[in-house]
From Swiss-Prot:
This is Selenide, water dikinase. The gene is selD. It catalyses: hydrogenselenide + ATP + H2O = selenophosphate + AMP + phosphate + 2 H(+). Its cofactor is Mg(2+). ATP binds at K20, T48, A49, D50, D68, D91, G138, H139, T140. Keywords: ATP-binding, Kinase, Magnesium, Metal-binding, Nucleotide-binding, Selenium, Selenocysteine, Transferase. Signal peptide: none annotated. GO terms for biological process: selenocysteine biosynthetic process.
Length: 348
């Protein structure tokens, strides 16, 4: 019997990190979980909504554990595999670590062409290999909607763990990739994006945060998270709350992918953006006349987005230069950390 040949994006209701449960609903669910007892070796757990868990094994080594998976946002199965793997590996880099082993998480309809699944797995394998980790197995579920990602284990020195809870007043805030992926993925699904812009979006999503994180070996950064489904302002809010600070974002310095503003002006906006805005906006003050489309994109759910880094002001410019030399060519200073004020975030 001939297998189905539907496009990947035709088999999903939402793609990439835009398919995540919204932050407000998720926070409500997680608030019902019991707290872990005071476990001395659990360095990072549930409390600060961080990117991964970190468990101290001994004085020299801690284990980083994370997983991530989502539905397709592109039709090319190999590229989808690359994007999903890059996104999954990112959490390890955000914690200051090195990925060691990864395992596939696969949901795929058995009625569909299995060569498509093979291409997805090849894309994931190649990105894991690029990261320096090993792909060692996985688990599958027969599901009408395809989903793919990785469970990743990494290591880090216990005294070099990076967190979203350690931003300091006086720090500068750096982003390592431009935003607007969610808006443009939505437009791409409708065939509304020029090919050179679509190629740029894919290039951004498959780029490993490994290259930006290489600079952490030379520069002492204070706090890091990665920007994914909750958007720039959503993950900035997590950092501000966890660190008990406020953060100022200079909107004119935030890098936005070509075409994203135009699509947002036309109302091409993923549902995840509205979920993010509903949850986060009460903690945000907007100062000045900032275009509505730009404000919207600050809430845009990113798929395999960049790192958000808080670092001492005197190190910020040199850190950006170093990251660019390592391949994070669009790294940019976008704001500052200030003492806790009335609002957690001010957009200027």
């Amino acid at each position: 019997m001939k297998k189905e040949q539907k496009k990947l994006t035709e088999m999903t209701t939402a793609g990439g990190u835009a398919a995540k449960i919204g932050p407000e609903v998720l926070a409500s669910v997680l608030s019902q979980l019991p707290k872990n007892d005071n476990i001395e070796n659990l360095l990072v757990g549930l409390d600060t909504a961080d990117d991964a868990a970190v468990y101290k094994l001994n004085d020299d080594m801690a284990l980083i554990q994370t997983l991530d998976f989502f539905t397709p946002m592109v039709d090319d199965p190999y590229v989808f595999g690359q994007i999903a793997a890059s996104n999954s590996l990112s959490d390890v880099y955000a914690m200051g670590g090195k990925p060691l082993v990864a395992m596939n998480i696969v949901c795929f309809p058995s009625c569909h062409d299995m060569d498509v699944l093979a291409e997805i797995l090849k894309g994931g394998f190649d990105k894991v290999k690029e990261s320096g980790a090993l792909l060692v197995g996985g688990h599958t579920v027969d599901d009408k909607e395809p989903k793919y990602g990785l469970s990743v284990s990494g290591i880090v020195s216990p005294n070099k763990v990076l967190s979203n809870a350690t931003a300091k007043p006086g720090d500068k805030l750096i982003i390592t990739k431009p935003i607007g992926v969610g808006v443009l993925n939505t437009a791409m699904k409708e065939g509304m994006v020029e090919q050179h812009i679509a190629d740029k979006v894919i290039e951004i999503m498959i780029h490993l945060n490994k290259y930006a994180a290489m600079s952490f070996e030379k520069f002492d950064v204070n706090s890091v998270t990665d920007i994914t489904g909750f958007g720039l302002l959503g993950h900035t809010l997590e950092m501000a709350k966890a660190s008990e600070v406020s953060i100022e974002i200079e909107s004119k310095h935030v890098p936005i992918i070509e075409g994203a503003i135009e699509m947002a002006q036309m109302g091409i906006i993923p549902a995840g953006m509205y979920k993010n805005m509903h949850y986060v906006s009460k903690d945000v003050e907007v100062v000045g006349n900032i275009e509505v489309a730009v404000q919207d994109i600050l809430y845009d759910p990113q798929t395999s987005g960049g790192l958000l880094i808080s670092v001492k002001e005197e190190l910020a410019e040199e850190l950006v230069k170093d990251m660019k030399l390592n391949g994070a060519i669009e790294a940019k200073i976008i704001g500052s950390v200030v003492p806790k004020g009335e609002k957690y975030i001010t957009v200027l």
